[in-house]
Amino acid sequence: MGKGGNQGEGAAEREVSVPTFSWEEIQKHNLRTDRWLVIDRKVYNITKWSIQHPGGQRVIGHYAGEDATDAFRAFHPDLEFVGKFLKPLLIGELAPEEPSQDHGKNSKITEDFRALRKTAEDMNLFKTNHVFFLLLLAHIIALESIAWFTVFYFGNGWIPTLITAFVLATSQAQAGWLQHDYGHLSVYRKPKWNHLVHKFVIGHLKGASANWWNHRHFQHHAKPNIFHKDPDVNMLHVFVLGEWQPIEYGKKKLKYLPYNHQHEYFFLIGPPLLIPMYFQYQIIMTMIVHKNWVDLAWAVSYYIRFFITYIPFYGILGALLFLNFIRFLESHWFVWVTQMNHIVMEIDQEAYRDWFSSQLTATCNVEQSFFNDWFSGHLNFQIEHHLFPTMPRHNLHKIAPLVKSLCAKHGIEYQEKPLLRALLDIIRSLKKSGKLWLDAYLHK
C-alpha cells in the first residue's frame, strides 16, 4: 500500500506543469534589477541572489539573459555543492522547441568542447600535484629569506639594496602567480581550503585583497576583452584598445591623451605605475569602502612584517621608498606578462560567442619552456587556462594538443608565439589602435 501511495505521489508531481520560456523572453531579463540565466536548459531568476554570489554580482550578472552552462562548469569545481544554491532560484525550463544555445551560438563547437572537458576529467587533469605547489611556496619563502640575508650580511649599500629589491620583486611576482592558482580553486578539492590559502598568499605575502582580486579577475575570465564587462580592458581613458574603441573615441573627438603616441607613453605610464600607484590605492580603498576587514587584516600583516624586517636597515622613510621601488619593479613584470596574452587579441563589444570561441578570440599562448613557464606562472598557456580555469597549471600543457585539434576541426585560430614576439606585439597593438584613433579623429 505504501508503494502504491508513493507511485501516486510521483505521478501527481509529474503532472505539475513546469513553466517554459523562449529565448526571446529570457533575453529581456538582462538588467541589473531583473536577471535570468540558463544552465543546462533550466531557467533561474538570480535577481536578488546575485548580491550574495561569492564571486560577486557583476560576474554572474554578465550572463543575464544568456546560457551560462559552460561558465558555470568552468568556475565551480564542485558542481553538486553549488547546485544546491540554484534549486530555490529555479523558475522553469527552456521550451522544448528552443535550442540550448542563445544568440545563434555554435552548438557543434559547444558539444565538442564539453566532450573535451569530459576527456580532461577522464585523464585526471583536474587532479592536483600538491608537491608542485608546495615547492612554489617554498621557493617564494626562500627568495624572501635570501633578500633579508643579503642586506643583513652585506649592509644597506646601493648594490646590496638593488640585489635585495630585485630578489623581493621576483618573490612578489611569483607570489602573484601562486595566489592566482588558489584564487581559481585549482589546488585543493574543497573551496574553503583554496580560499584560506589564497588569503594567506595574496594578503600576508603580497599585501593585497582576495575579494578585490576575485571581483576583478572572475569578470575578466567570464567575458574576456569585452568592453563594459571585462575590467582589464577599462583603461580609464589612458589607452584605447582594439579596433572598435579607438574609432569610437575618434568619431566622438575624445582626446584625453594623444593616443597616437600611446605606444610610446606606455613605457612611462603602464608598467611603472600600475601596481605602485593604481592597484595599491584601489586595493586599500576597496577593502575600506566594502568593509573587507578580514582581507585588510591579512594585508596589514604583510606591511607589519615588511617594515619590522627592513626599518632597522633603512629607517621608516627609507623602508617606505624601498617598498615602492619593489612594487615598481614587480609592476613591470606583471604588466608585460599579463598583457601579452590579451591586449593583442580582439577587444570589442559583446558578441555573444560560445565559451570556447570567446576564449580563443581573446587569448593567445606563448611557447613553452622551463623559463617561460616559471616567468609567466604558466600563463603562457593562457588559452588552456581560460578554457579550464580550475585545472592545476602543471597540467595545462597536457590538454593543449587536444585544444589545438579542436581549433583545427572548427577552423578557429590557435595563436602561439615566442616570448619576445609576444612582448613586442603589445607595442605593435597599441600603435595600431593609436593610428585608428588618429584617422577617425581627423577624418570621421
Curated annotation (Swiss-Prot):
This is Acyl-CoA 6-desaturase. PROSITE patterns: CYTOCHROME_B5_2. A motif (Histidine box-3) lies at residues 382-386. Residues 1-131, 179-264, 327-444 are cytoplasmic. Residues 18-95 form the Cytochrome b5 heme-binding domain. Pathway: Lipid metabolism; polyunsaturated fatty acid biosynthesis. Induction: Repressed by dietary highly unsaturated fatty acids. A motif (Histidine box-1) lies at residues 180-184. The gene is FADS2. Belongs to the fatty acid desaturase type 1 family. Residues 153-157, 286-305 are lumenal. Its main location: endoplasmic reticulum. It comes from Homo sapiens (Human).
